A protein has these predicted regions:
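Short hydrophobic short-linear motifs embedded
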Residues: 1-3, 8, 82, 162-168
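A short, charge-rich alpha-helical start-of-domain segment used by transcription regulators
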Residues: 1-22, 32-35, 46, 115
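Sigma70-family region 2
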Residues: 2, 40-57, 75-76
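Acidic, proline/glycine-rich intrinsically disordered inter-domain spacer in sigma factors
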Residues: 4-7, 75, 79-108
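Conserved RNAP core-binding helix
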Residues: 31-48, 139
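Arg/Lys-rich amphipathic alpha helix in sigma70-family domain 2
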Residues: 63-84, 96, 155, 159
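DNA-recognition helix of helix-turn-helix
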Residues: 66, 135-159
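A short pre-motif secondary-structure segment
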Residues: 117-121
Length: 168
């Protein structure tokens, strides 16, 4: 680096900060958590420059951020719930083996993966191929996640409007 500036790789990484912030804030819905996530992403990227083998830097950065966020969510899921739950209000998903927790986590993860895909396509303008690389899944999986996410949004929005029935 000349004159105390960043090396070219660092400059390219720095240029992704606004997009990373936008994605992280949409993903976490919390400015402080998003800023921490972006900072951790930048540190990880700069330390892992040797692992970047060319290609689309922005997609690589989104991959790092997405993985860090998934790790954060897994860590939160392992923490005990501090507020008491009234067993009479909640359906018994656990069954005799107590596997309900796994079902809940699987459902939450699926929804998060759909949100990630939708945000990367709609908010960040990534192609389906780039989203597939970020999420480390086949492109068909991305297409399915997007279709389900869009259907859920449509269903939610339709539920917000008054229902009108046709009278014949």
């Amino acid at each position: 680096a000349t004159g105390g500036g960043l090396a070219p790789f660092g400059q390219e990484v720095e240029a992704t900060i606004p997009a990373l912030r936008r994605y992280a804030r949409a993903l976490t819905r919390d400015r402080d958590i998003a800023d921490d996530l972006v900072q951790d992403t930048l540190v990880r990227a700069l330390r892992s420059e040797h692992l970047f083998h060319g290609g689309e830097l922005r997609s690589w950065m989104y991959t790092i951020l997405t993985n860090l966020n998934r790790n954060r969510l897994r860590s939160l899921a392992r923490r005990p719930i501090l507020s008491p739950i009234d067993d009479n209000d909640a359906p018994d998903l656990a069954g005799p083996e107590g596997g309900g927790r796994d079902i809940s986590r699987a459902l939450a993860a699926r929804v998060d993966e759909q949100r990630e895909a939708l945000l990367l396509v709609v908010l960040e303008g990534l192609s389906y191929r780039e989203v597939a690389e970020v999420q480390a899944v086949p492109i068909g999986t991305v297409m399915s996640r997007l279709a389900r996410a869009r259907a859920q949004i449509k269903s939610y929005l339709d539920g917000e409007r008054p229902t009108l029935r046709r009278v014949k």
